[in-house]
A protein has these predicted regions:
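Flexible, acidic/Gly-rich N-terminal and inter-domain linker regions that tether
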Residues: 1-114
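Solvent-exposed alpha-helical segments within well-ordered globular domains of core cellular machineries
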Residues: 20, 59, 149, 192-195, ...
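Short linear Ser/Thr-Pro motifs
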Residues: 78, 119-120, 133, 213, ...
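Short aromatic/hydrophobic contact patches that present stacked aromatics
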Residues: 84, 115-119, 211, 278
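Canonical Radical SAM [4Fe-4S] cluster-binding loop centered on the CxxxCxxC motif
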Residues: 104-156
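Intrinsically disordered, low-complexity terminal tails and inter-domain linkers enriched
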Residues: 105-110, 162-168
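Conserved AdoMet/S-adenosylmethionine-binding subsite of the radical SAM
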Residues: 159-162, 171-300
Length: 300
């Protein structure tokens, strides 16, 4: 199912696409860049806060766009380390975004390295046995603006606790696409989101600090390797042989290890980034010595 909002969000635009619309509406092209600065550097959430824009232009923006596409329904904290957000989208769909704090010189928001785990689909179609995301099935792909809005929601919240907002940089250190959904199954949204995050006019967030976790869509891994977005790749493995992995991850029946591992290594060779192999130990299924031995062969 595809959802189309009454008005698009500005977070789905690139500088190029926004500038094109601005010029078509009869405004100077430089207004596009000014808007992006207010969005990503100043993190404003209302049109009137864009104080260097003429009222007529702000009125036009208000008629064309909305800002945020997410509304926080629940904020659950755990020992000052993990903070989970239940976010409601415009069509009342629910997704989760998680902020993980890793204390460095002490426990506390200012001294923590922060990682944001974002969702890219509502539900999931892949049915991995250890994951709750697919229990209710797949509902729809998220739009670019819905993914970016998750990150900007965290930015605005954390701005109150850090000095980074004054420096006009993101108020977190890493982004992982490990929330609800399979990132490579919403491929175009994934790539466009990464480009917005990476852009100088966007969050100016380094690709090496972005990790894409996949259940193993081998052809998409090969395609991503050619995109010019040198993100990190994590393979949700959880089984070191086809027999075991297929029990845990149905996707393995379509893309077995003989296809997945070469694709992952080709991605690594293309970008020079170390691969992450994710492996949850499940008693009496994948925790044998034989599995450990096979895993070491894959990891070499």
């Amino acid at each position: 199912m595809k959802f189309t909002p009454e008005k698009p969000s500005l977070f789905g635009e690139t500088l190029e696409s926004l500038t094109e619309r601005v010029v078509e509406a009869g405004f100077p092209s430089f207004r596009g860049k000014q808007v992006m600065e207010w969005l990503y550097k100043k993190r404003v959430d209302e049109w009137d806060a864009m104080s260097n824009l003429p009222k007529a232009f702000r009125t036009w923006l208000d008629g064309q766009y909305i800002l945020y596409l997410t509304n926080s329904l629940l904020d659950k904290r755990s020992d000052d380390v993990t903070q989970k957000f239940l976010l409601e989208l415009e069509d009342k769909s629910l997704i989760e975004t998680v902020l993980i704090r890793a204390p460095q010189t002490g426990v506390g928001q200012e001294s923590s390295r922060k990682t944001v785990c974002v969702s890219i689909q509502v539900g999931c179609a892949y049915g991995c046995k250890f994951c709750d995301s697919g229990l209710a099935g797949f509902k729809r792909n998220l739009m670019v603006a819905e993914v970016v809005s998750q990150l900007m929601h965290i930015c605005k919240m954390e701005d109150a606790h850090t000095k980074r907002a004054k420096e006009e940089i993101a108020s977190f250190d890493n982004i992982v696409f490990m929330g609800m959904g399979e990132p490579l199954a919403n491929y175009d949204t994934l790539v466009q989101t990464i480009k917005i995050l990476n852009a100088e006019w966007g969050l100016n967030f380094g690709a090496r600090r972005i990790t894409v976790s996949t259940s193993g869509l081998a052809p998409r891994i090969m395609q991503l390797a050619q995109e010019g977005v040198a993100v990190r790749l994590a393979i949700s493995l959880h089984g070191a042989t086809n027999e075991v992995r297929s029990q845990i991850m149905p996707v393995n029946k379509k893309y077995p290890l003989e296809e997945l591992i070469p694709a992952a290594k080709a991605f690594k060779d293309k970008h020079g980034r170390m691969l992450t192999l994710e492996f949850i130990m499940i008693e009496d299924i994948n925790d044998s010595l034989d599995q450990a031995k096979e895993l070491t062969k894959i990891a070499r």
